[in-house]
Amino acid sequence: MINIRKTHPLMKIINNSFIDLPAPSNISSWWNFGSLLGICLVIQILTGLFLAMHYTSDTTTAFSSVTHICRDVNYGWLIRYLHANGASMFFICLFLHVGRGLYYGSYMFLETWNIGVLLLFAVMATAFMGYVLPWGQMSFWGATVITNLLSAIPYIGSDLVQWIWGGFSVDKATLTRFFAFHFILPFIIAALAGVHLLFLHETGSNNPTGISSDADKIPFHPYYTIKDILGALLLILILTTLVLFSPDLLGDPDNYTPANPLNTPPHIKPEWYFLFAYAILRSIPNKLGGVLALVLSILVLAFIPLLHTSKQRSMMFRPISQCLFWILVADLLTLTWIGGQPVEHPFIIIGQLASILYFLLILVLMPITSLLENNLLKW
């Protein structure tokens, strides 16, 4: 009997991607985050779809419609908090996924890595626009502050900002277009994730050692399907715990106050997952410089393959590079903390030092250390 799984045009693609895919025998739990990100995206699209059925993208009714979802719609509160905290889980998985790529040298798959960087930008844009939709105080002022940064672009800046706003301030036109973009972008992200996977399967997965695993492959199913299911269960456990016990833990209380253009909140800050970039933005006194640093804080990931000077791919056998990697992680945590603090002494100087260290580590210290390790190993 002909095996339909291997012959049917559509089933064949699924089979070669998730069932008979040859995978390295030694990939650890750090390789689980790709599938977890896929699950997060599905959760976000489904909950978002149901929220969109009850949401109205009008400045006069947006805040009320979110309240209506939470109070009057059957399990509306659950859908809303799954969506809000699902975004947090999405970013946790994203950061761990990127960190894994940095540590084990997965960035040597250039196409896969660059599409990954593009995906990161797309997810960040989607999350930012989603945060504006409830039309609370932090939604409105966050949108005002961040869109205003584009005015730092020479010559076309102010025109560009008005074009994005659809007027002379963040208003109804802005909210409507942000809702439209927030709805369409996740589907673009899903398509990009498909391309990401396509390029990954051209080369096969990397593994912790960083050396070729062609000599020792195992089928994806059942070994890694069962491993991914375990990861998914843990993800869902953490998400449901967060949603059911402390749904507002990661949110901002200011967003429970309806947007008021006449009253500025004392501390304007984005959601926690943008705080590291926000801290880098604030640490530079010049507006254009700050915007460039903000973009570069993410875009620097695209340059990492060019900065790889080591003879080894992975950091598994490079203790000095490992030290620098964990200093980078600590630095990012410091930046996240600083981003949530008011602009006053000593937070200003800590933020500036942490920002300098961030770029110094990635652009200077890590490549030099890799060269040093090559010499120490007499390579």
From Swiss-Prot:
GO biological process annotation, one example: mitochondrial electron transport, ubiquinol to cytochrome c
Membrane-protein topology: Multi-pass membrane protein
Single Gene Ontology MF annotation: metal ion binding
Keyword Iron on entry: yes
Binding locations of heme b b562: H83, H182
Cofactor note: Binds 2 heme b groups non-covalently.
Localization in the cell: Mitochondrion inner membrane
Record-annotated disulphide pairs: none
Function: Component of the ubiquinol-cytochrome c reductase complex (complex III or cytochrome b-c1 complex) that is part of the mitochondrial respiratory chain. The b-c1 complex mediates electron transfer from ubiquinol to cytochrome c. Contributes to the generation of a proton gradient across the mitochondrial membrane that is then used for ATP synthesis.
Note: Heme 1 (or BL or b562) is low-potential and absorbs at about 562 nm, and heme 2 (or BH or b566) is high-potential and absorbs at about 566 nm.
Subunit structure: The cytochrome bc1 complex contains 11 subunits: 3 respiratory subunits (MT-CYB, CYC1 and UQCRFS1), 2 core proteins (UQCRC1 and UQCRC2) and 6 low-molecular weight proteins (UQCRH/QCR6, UQCRB/QCR7, UQCRQ/QCR8, UQCR10/QCR9, UQCR11/QCR10 and a cleavage product of UQCRFS1). This cytochrome bc1 complex then forms a dimer.
Protein's name according to its UniProt entry: Cytochrome b
Organism for this UniProt entry: Nectogale elegans
